[in-house]
Amino acid sequence: MALVIYTKPGCPYCQQARDHYNSKGIPFIDYDAQNDSARRKEMFAYSGGDPTVPCIVEDGKYLGSGWGNPPRG
């Protein structure tokens, strides 16, 4: 499984997503969509232009943007 989380620095919801996956022992790749324009472009391609982070993608499939209770992704 390849889980990717597109985030931005200082985002508390992004940190909640990281903490969730870390607590479950699920490995993920964390991309900075704010400061890396190429990653931001990728994120927009998955999310249909939605700028909401975290944006979660698993095995190339868009799972959702944002973080709530219950967690998305």
Protein language model regions, located:
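Local sequence-structure signature of Cys/Sec-based thiol-disulfide redox active-site neighborhoods
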Residues: 1-29
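Glycine-/small-residue-rich active-site loops that bind phosphorylated ligands and cofactors
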Residues: 12, 35, 63
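Thioredoxin-like thiol-disulfide oxidoreductase module
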Residues: 32-50
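Structural micro-motif
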Residues: 47-57, 67
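Non-catalytic, surface beta->alpha helical segment in thiol-disulfide oxidoreductase systems
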Residues: 58-73
